[in-house]
Each structure stands twice: as C-alpha cells, then as structure tokens.
Amino acid sequence: MSGSMAQAFAHNFLGQSPRWYKASIVAFLLLNPPLFFAVSPAAAGWCLVIEFIFTLAMALKCYPLMPGGLLLVQALVLGMTTPQALYDELVHNFPVILLLMFMVAGIYFMKELLLYLFSRLLLGVRSKALLGLLFCFLSAFLSAFLDALTVTAVIISAAVGFYSVYHRVASGNDPRQDSAFADDQQLPALHHDDLEQFRAFLRSLLMHGAVGTALGGVCTLVGEPQNLLIGHEMGWHFADFFSKVAPVSMPVLAAGLVTCVLLEKLRWFGYGTLLPDNVRQVLANYAAEDDAQRTSRQRAALLVQGLAALILIVALALHVAEVGLIGLLVIVLITAFTGITDEHRLGNAFKDAMPFTALLVVFFAVVAVIHQQQLFTPLIQWVLALPADQQPGMLFIANGLLSAISDNVFVATIYITEVKQAFISGQMSREHFETLAIAINTGTNLPSVATPNGQAAFLFLLTSAIAPLVRLSYGRMVWMALPYTVVMGLLGWYAVSYWL
C-alpha cells in the first residue's frame, strides 16, 4: 500500500511532465538549501535565477507557475527574500497586474473585430515579406503609444482565431462552434502538412509582431514602463524624450524593419514560410460566409467593438487612467452594448490571462530575490568606475545582459537610481547624465529581446494559448529572435557609443 501510495504521489507531482523534468525540479529543491547556508545567499540567489530560467525554457513540458512557484516558496522559507519584499514588488508593479487582469479580457471581447480586420490583411496581402513588414511596423507604431502587452494580446487573439478556424474546418467541425482545436487526432492525415506549414507561418508573424513591440516601445515616453520611469527622473516630457532617444531608436527601428524583410526573403531562422493555398482557401471561405451571414445585430456588435477600440486608443494615448482600468472600461462598454450578460461568457475572457498573471507574481518574487541579495550591484559599480567615454557603451551592454534575465523595469530602476546618485554627488555633468539615461533606456529595451524573460510581451507570448498550438517553445523563440538581437544590440551599442 505504501509503495503504491508513493508511486501515486510521484505520478501526481507535476502531472504529465517527463520524469527527467520532475527529477530536475527535485534536484533544484535539494541543492538550494546547502548552497544558501554552506556557500552564500548570493550563490543560492544566482542558482535560483538560473533554475527559474530553466522552468521558462521548458514551458511546453510544464507550465512554469508550478515548478517556479515551488522554487520561490523555498526561497521565501530560506530567507532569500521576504513576503513583505514580494508584496512591495507587487504593489510597485500593480499597473501591470491590472493590465493583465482587465486589458487582455477587454481584447477578448474585441476578437470578432480583430479577426475581421486581420483576415482582410492576411488574405489581401500575398507577399509574405510585405505581410511580415506590416505586422512588425504596425506593432512598433502601436507600441509607441499603447502598451506592448496590449498589442501582443491583439496579435495573439487574431492568431488563435485563424488557427481555430482552420483546425476546426480541417477536422470536420463547425468553425463557429466552441469545439476543441488543440488536439490533432481528429485531423485527417492529408491536412497534417498544411497544418505544420500554417504553424510555421503563424510563428513567424507572431515573432515579427513581438519584436515590433520592442522596436516601437523604446521610442516614446509611454512606450514602456521603464521609459516613463526614466523620463520622470530626467524631467523629460513626450517630445523631449522622443528627440533625446531618436539618435538611437530611429536607426534601430529602420534596421529592425530591414531585418524583417531580409529574414522573409532569405528564409533564415525559421522565417519565410508561406501561407498554404488550402489554408488560404479555408480562411477566405470563412470570411466570405461570415460576410454573407452577418446579421444586423452582428454588424451592430462590430460597430460597438470598433467604437470601443477607438476609445481605447484615445484613452491610452492621453493616459486618462491606468491601462488596466481602461481595459475594464472596454469590457463594460462592449458587454453592455452587445448583450453579453451571462457570467460564464464573461468568465471565458479571463481564462487566458490569469495563469500568466500568477506566473508574473512568481517572476516578481525572483526580482525581489535579486534586489535583496544585490546580485546586480557589483556589475553596476564596475561600470560606473570606468572612464566616462566608455560608460555609455558598457552601460548599454550591462543593461542588455541583465534585462535578458530579469525585469526591464527593475533593471532600469536600479541603474537610473545609482546614476542619479552619482550625478547629485557631482561625479558627472548634466550632459553626461542624460547620455547615460539614454543608454539605460535603450539598453533595457533593445538587447532584451534575446530571451522571453527579457520582455514581458515575449513572456506573455511564450505562455499564451497560441504558443503550444504553433509549437513556439522557449528555444525556438530565442533562435528566431537571434538575428533581431544581433542587429538591434550591435547597432544600439554603436549609436549609444558614437552618436550621442
């Protein structure tokens, strides 16, 4: 009985995850206490960061919330950080949590409009290079004024819509019914090749869109949370921020868009896959049927969604309230004026975002450990000890490396605080202070596309509903982001070092 009970516990632990994965998590949990007590808390802290990155990298084996959560519970018990420090980190990042709770749900209620608009774009543009460029540019443009997570949620919603329509039709189901589309077992063998090609096609568009959020987000005061933080510390307004950062952001934006076209033309790094003709036909038929069968109530609903989208853009651009609260406004407007009053239908809108919201809390616990154990402090002190002319370039590199494994806002906060203290104490001129602030801003935004945990939008994409459907793993995201990382990182470093 005891043997079977032990087997049951072992089987239940992390569910269907591979045995080697379960053994790895157990090994991590056994390794951390001796490291903490026998070596040093800092060594255990760095080990924890690496272990958490491992759980993110294996997201398709097991959702990172469970193994990452176990590691962070242990970190709290050991004293690597405190519940109060975690709470303070959550309060500091509460706008992001609000955004995930309400904005992503708000986008869910706009999915009919998004599917309508994106299907026109997808079916109307036959050149894959032009389509990739449009996705990248539109994401960059929107992210300069809206939040990157909001833009990513829009792209994910559209991709899930396309995938579900084709998968249901290919499986012999009604595309308008809520049938499962994650299981390929009902799919006839003749559709498998088309589905694999369609997955590769969607992967490339998703990655172009995700990189676009970073290209546009770096440009303006409202593009990323850390931009607002740095702008506040420097006393820069919208126009000031744009003009100060432009010598770096504009060349990088142009280079990023050129990279997008070249990747599609050369078909490198998993890009260049075309939309299969059979899939195009299915989507075109669906769009035509939708147009023919659309009732006056459905047209009215589309109109309401369009007006809500307009209100959303204006409200975000003018910053009338926190992003999450604007998302709640969108939910209220669309549901009230389209007749969605059933609690179950409302609940479906929150299903996708809540697991990621919980995972983000675990991520902020890692940030709290980094902060409390001062894991980044030696690197910061080393950069500020360099000659003044070397500091901008090295600050860009240091920011990029740390932002690739940690939270952008956290890294920017630490660096701008340290640099401002040095400025106040008379260690540098105002001009040099501004140059370093630009290096911090661009360093936290551009090279951090290297890994999914470097950008919140990338992490959201990795752990979203679309990632397992199109086989977008951590490793594949790193590989597909690599050319962008090299171009954006090298040009960004050169611009910071020689053009400011």
Curated annotation (Swiss-Prot):
Q: Identify the keywords attached in UniProt to this record, alphabetized.
A: Antiport, Cell inner membrane, Cell membrane, Ion transport, Membrane, Sodium, Sodium transport, Transmembrane, Transmembrane helix, Transport
Gene Ontology MF annotations: sodium:proton antiporter activity
Q: How does it sit in the membrane?
A: Multi-pass membrane protein
Where does this protein reside within or beyond the cell? Cell inner membrane
The source's superkingdom equals Bacteria
Q: Chief subcellular site?
A: membrane
Q: Which GO terms describe its cellular component?
A: plasma membrane
Q: Please write the reaction equations for the catalytic activity of this protein.
A: 2 Na(+)(in) + 3 H(+)(out) = 2 Na(+)(out) + 3 H(+)(in)
Q: Which residues cross the membrane?
A: 34-54, 62-82, 90-110, 129-149, 150-170, 205-225, 241-261, 311-331, 350-370, 394-414, 449-469, 477-497
Q: Which family does it belong to?
A: Belongs to the NhaB Na(+)/H(+) (TC 2.A.34) antiporter family.
Q: What does this protein do?
A: Na(+)/H(+) antiporter that extrudes sodium in exchange for external protons.
**NCBIfam families from the UniProt entry:** PRK09547.1
**What is the protein's given name?**
Na(+)/H(+) antiporter NhaB
Species assigned in the record: Pseudomonas fluorescens (strain ATCC BAA-477 / NRRL B-23932 / Pf-5)
